[in-house]
Swiss-Prot record:
The protein, known as: Ras-like protein 2
Compartments reported by the entry: Cell membrane
Organism placement in taxonomy: Eukaryota, Fungi, Dikarya, Ascomycota, Pezizomycotina
A Pfam family matched in the record: Ras
Species of origin: Pyricularia oryzae (strain 70-15 / ATCC MYA-4617 / FGSC 8958) (Rice blast fungus)
Protein's job: Modulates the activity of the adenylate cyclase catalytic subunit and therefore affects the biosynthesis of cyclic-AMP. Plays a role in both surface attachment and surface recognition of appressoria, a highly specialized infection structure for plant penetration. Regulates appressorium formation by coordinated regulation of cAMP signaling and Pmk1 MAPK pathways.
Length: 214
């Protein structure tokens, strides 16, 4: 199929507690390798050009600090982000419980009832150390009206799909917001009424998608 010549940039933000694998997911997406040891992130930005569902996309991915001492920086990147990956580790219940705080803060900063997000349960390769069931992750995402996916940065399981899904959700959200603003004339605060399907099959991981490093 013909691809659009317009290069649309998507500002994606990866949030979550410390040590959940945010940097590993981002680097695996951008550079296709797993980083086992690294210093805790303060804030790193990466760019990569992709074709997702026959549309060109430039992903501008912000990898954020999970440590509480950097929490004052959160509102700044939450204001500019177009879509958020809410990452926890399936081996850490504490990191799972922190996800709600991130979600609520994003909605407060955006002054919205809904905004494009994907809940990501990382480290699914460590099944023997699992503290959070898949069903719990799905239930949390359902309560947020967003999609859920389990990933492994180490084994590169569903890494691309997690980022592609948030781009797809941004596109859908923007289309609905355009229709919403030109429709009944109601407030935009609520956002689209038809949220992303939570239970889509992970088998769609690479459909019509490819990336090129910028």
């Amino acid at each position: 199929m013909a691809q659009s010549k317009f290069l649309r940039e998507y500002k994606l933000v990866v949030v979550g507690g410390g040590g959940v694998g945010k940097s590993c997911l981002t680097i695996q997406l951008i550079q296709s390798h797993f980083v086992d040891e690294y210093d805790p992130t303060i804030e790193d930005s990466y760019r990569k050009q992709c074709v997702i569902d026959d549309e060109v996309a430039l992903l501008d991915v912000l990898d954020t600090a999970g440590q509480e001492e950097y929490s004052a920086m959160r509102e700044q990147y939450m204001r500019t982000g177009e879509g958020f990956l809410l990452v926890y580790s399936i081996t850490s219940r504490q990191s799972f419980e922190e996800i709600t705080t991130f979600q609520q803060q994003i909605l407060r900063v955006k002054d919205k009832d809904y905004f494009p997000m994907v809940v990501v349960g990382n480290k699914c390769d460590l099944e023997g150390e699992r503290e959070v069931t898949r069903q719990e992750g799905e239930a949390l995402a359902r309560s947020f009206n967003c999609k859920f996916i389990e990933t492994s940065a180490k084994s590169r399981i569903n890494v691309d799909k997690a980022f592609y899904d948030i781009v797809r959700e941004i596109r859908r959200y923007n289309r609905e917001m355009q229709g919403y603003s030109t429709g009944s004339g109601g407030s935009n605060a609520g956002g689209p009424s038809n949220k992303m399907e939570v239970n889509d099959s992970d088998a769609e991981a690479g459909c019509c998608s490819k990336c090129v490093l910028m």
